[in-house]
């Protein structure tokens, strides 16, 4: 992976990242294709309608079904999905933690029950990389020990100890596999844990900074803490993160979260929020969000956002989308998802532009002003 820090405005950054399959600028939002597809959209939508340069797929889900062997037989995720740009795959640790009621965390890994058939599985630092080698993803995430917040100091310390242990095991294994010709062209990111405990976050960040990861992620946030505490945690981490590697805030979040964390030096984001909200009838716009199912939109001839240039806004009215949603027409999910993802990707583009123009502070002021804040 090639990484270039192109410009800074305060702590906000524009970086250029080149993988084996695409080049993209940050700040970047990565649409989430949990099972190898962004819900209701295909590779053509992602490339031609949205021009997404990188998307995320989920190791836990793809490991269980269709299995990594099947994906490998198709030539990895790119051959399987026909999305020929960059893929980031997470380690599956979060899903093993959140979807399995009886998951157990040991120093060896995470034992969990499949949410599909109840079968038992073990994720280890090595096994999740083996799965991602089969996927041939451009960016692989290591296994980390996530804790739900609030958590005791003792549990947070165990999480950091275990995450550092697994990080060492993962990076050593990855380098040894590359020496054998496996994982060439694949990049590996470490994940910083520590909850909202300043000392533990710092300890984890400093330890992972010493390891030759291609990038660093901030995990374990947006899991129950207040937004202000999340922002403070990210800001406090900034001095301890290597400037010459990408910074990825996992699973975050709202448009406001993106703006606030870009201001605090984050480069990469992913979240299911735009597509999940789309399926529930909620649209993100330059003036905030609203739900299309309200009766006031039945005869509304306006686009979802008159300032938006997405396929949905250029072709269809709020009244039509109100009708599709109430009729439970499947077409609605595609049109709504196209709009919401376009909004997120366009927000990232506007932030890049503002940073390059040294006007991010003014951009943020205008962003909130349009929302009446």
UniProtKB/Swiss-Prot annotation:
What's this protein's name?
Queuine tRNA-ribosyltransferase
Give the disulfide map. Answer: none
- Textual note on the cofactor: Binds 1 zinc ion per subunit.
The source's superkingdom equals Bacteria
The cross-references to InterPro entries, in alphabetical order and at most eight, read: TGT (IPR004803), TGT-like_sf (IPR036511), tRNA_ribo_trans-like (IPR002616)
Which NCBIfam families does the annotation name? Q_tRNA_tgt, tgt_general
User: What residues make up the catalytic site?
Assistant: 90, 270
Stated family:
Belongs to the queuine tRNA-ribosyltransferase family.
Q: How does it assemble?
A: Homodimer. Within each dimer, one monomer is responsible for RNA recognition and catalysis, while the other monomer binds to the replacement base PreQ1.
Give the main EC class. transferase
Q: Where does Zn(2+) bind?
A: 308, 310, 313, 339
This protein's pathway? tRNA modification; tRNA-queuosine biosynthesis
| Cofactors, names only | Zn(2+)
In its UniProt record, which GO terms are filed under biological process?
Answer: queuosine biosynthetic process; tRNA-guanine transglycosylation
Q: What are the annotated GO cellular component locations?
A: cytosol
Recorded GO MF terms: metal ion binding; tRNA-guanosine(34) queuine transglycosylase activity
Q: Which UniProt keywords apply?
A: Glycosyltransferase, Metal-binding, Queuosine biosynthesis, Transferase, tRNA processing, Zinc
């Amino acid at each position: 992976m090639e990484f270039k820090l192109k410009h800074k405005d305060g702590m906000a950054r524009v970086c250029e990242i080149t993988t084996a399959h695409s080049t993209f600028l940050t700040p970047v939002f990565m649409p989430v294709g949990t099972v190898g597809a962004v819900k209701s959209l295909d590779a053509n939508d992602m490339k031609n309608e949205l021009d997404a340069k990188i998307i995320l797929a989920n190791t836990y889900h793809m490991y269980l079904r269709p299995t990594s062997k099947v994906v490998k037989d198709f030539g990895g995720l790119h051959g399987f999905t026909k999305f020929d740009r960059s893929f980031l795959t997470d380690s599956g640790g979060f899903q093993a933690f959140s979807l399995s009621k009886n998951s157990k965390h040991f120093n060896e890994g995470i034992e969990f029950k499949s949410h599909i058939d109840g079968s038992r599985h073990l994720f280890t630092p090595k096994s999740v990389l083996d799965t991602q080698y089969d996927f041939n993803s451009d960016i692989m995430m290591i296994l980390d020990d996530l804790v739900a917040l609030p958590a005791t100091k003792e549990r947070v310390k165990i999480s950091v100890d275990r995450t550092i242990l697994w990080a060492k095991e993962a990076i050593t294994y990855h380098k040894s596999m590359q020496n054998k010709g496996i994982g060439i062209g694949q990049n590996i990111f470490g994940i910083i844990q520590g909850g909202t405990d300043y000392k533990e976050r710092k300890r984890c960040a400093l330890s992972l900074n010493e390891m030759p990861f291609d990038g660093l992620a901030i995990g374990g946030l947006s899991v129950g803490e207040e937004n202000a505490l999340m922002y403070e945690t990210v800001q406090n981490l900034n001095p301890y993160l290597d400037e010459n590697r990408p910074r990825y805030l996992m699973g975050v979040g709202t448009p406001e979260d993106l703006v606030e964390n870009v201001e605090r030096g984050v480069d990469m984001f992913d979240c299911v929020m735009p597509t999940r909200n789309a399926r529930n009838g909620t649209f993100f716009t330059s003036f905030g969000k609203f739900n299309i199912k309200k009766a006031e939109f039945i005869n509304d001839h306006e686009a979802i956002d008159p300032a938006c240039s997405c396929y949905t806004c250029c072709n269809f009215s709020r009244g039509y989308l109100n009708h599709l949603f109430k009729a439970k027409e499947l077409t609605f999910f595609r049109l709504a998802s196209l709009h919401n993802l376009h909004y997120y990707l366009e927000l990232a583009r506007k932030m890049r532009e503002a940073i390059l123009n040294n006007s991010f502070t003014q951009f943020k002021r205008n962003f909130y002003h349009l929302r009446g804040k």
